[in-house]
Amino acid sequence: MSRFRIADTRVKILLVRLRQIGDVVFTTPTFAALRDHFPSAQLTYLVEPAAASVVAGNADLSAVIVAPRAPGVRGFVADLALGRRLARERFDLVLDFHGGPRAALLTWLSRAPCRVGYEVSGRAWMYTQRVARPRELRPRHSVENQWDLLTAIGVPPPDRGRYPVVMPLVRDTATQVRQRLASHGVAHDARIVVMHVSAGNPFRRWPLEAFASVAAALPAVDARVRVIVTSGPSEADAAAQVIRDARERLAPEVREQVLACGEFSLAELRALVDDAALYIGGDSGPMHVAATTRVPMVSLYGPTLPARSEPWRAGSLPALAVEVHGLACRPCDQRVCEPGDFRCLGQISPGRVIDAATQLLLRNG
């Protein structure tokens, strides 16, 4: 495969990853690496609205283009117009981390002389350079899979200590989150445990009653613990159920140590975790947002493997993975089990998560 070479480092580069919060987070280590390789480059990121806050305000990016997705003919016409806009930008290089039909089309419409993407049947012709599509179940980290596109243009291999995942902290948002916590009675010296109880993918949802068991156990570890239960924007009922069930197991005087503080946007969740003592959650977008902080983490893995999606950050930062070993079906394509009958997650006991959380709380207390 020929490698992209350019003598003038003032190259214009477009990075494409349209959606899936975790996958957008997984592209963020490439920003600093590209900046090191092309010191004067202009880096532009193309993303759909749901994940745009992950990359907003990143100092290594020159611009972010937010591309709403519309259905049917209207969406196709809008994409043609967006393609013309991209062509006018005269990008030298496009890296399509996404690889889906829409991303490939927009990459091709950019008319960049070098367009790097995955070897996918029916779309490979849209790229001038192609790399092998990573095998979905291969136990290799997603950051490394996406880095294959950088390898194709001569960028050195990834180093998670030097190039961790990044999501900028918005200072005003952090102030607003602290004010919200105070309004719910959370003291400034509280040891906040953020427990995210939902996942966009139903195959990655640990049972709510298990989360409730963990939430009810943690106040006994440290009287300063306050468990903030969070969920996706359409799953507030799940958070409410966990809080209700946990409080039923607690003595009246400590029931308020498990609570919700309203809904959190991605930027607000990033700020909330930044002030936390611990994050607990499954393999989901919010977990990877949490990984952009230095906060200790307990991550739960069912159909996926830590080797593929563990927090991509310096090894010195505390993070424990809880998973079940010995299941021949792991990892899987997350299409076979019936919802509610996930033996991989179902075999993770609350006790194991409580032990992991206690270990990190005591270690960093």
Q: Can you name each region flagged by the protein language model?
A:
Residues 1-365:
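Catalytic machinery of carbohydrate-active enzymes
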